[in-house]
Amino acid sequence: MGWVARIDTPRRVEEQRVTATVTAPSVLDLTFVELGTDGRFLAVGCDIAAWITFYASAQARNADTARPIVEDPPLSAGVLLDLSFDGVIPWLLPAPGSTYSNGESPLRARLFARIRTALNVAHAATVTVRALIEHDTVPS
């Protein structure tokens, strides 16, 4: 594999995604497209009680469908980060060094997520990722 140039200056970004409105506990998929191919999680926000999981690829997200929340994912499953929001504290700071990297082939500037909600009333979730992009170009 040849040398892959990084971006000139790593930069902080924030990307927000809003789910569809649902009326019962739900599992919803999100895709972030402005966070580059590789970076570091600085903070993640969610405005409702939910469990959010980030993945290296859509395939990893699909393979994780049946995993119970109380169970850790297998090693090398493509699960990057699991966060539980209580609906009271809207922002969580992942452990220092929590990184993401797109694991698809061909490489794409995508970060995949799944949000699991437990509310029995109409709700939509706003999920926000603050990140430090370290690599944002896709080799041609």
Predicted feature residues:
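Short linear motifs in intrinsically disordered/low-complexity regions
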Residues: T9, L30, G39, I48, ...
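Beta-rich globular "head" domains
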Residues: E14-V18, T23-N62, E134
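C-terminal interaction-tip segments
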Residues: V4-A24, S105-R110, R114-S140
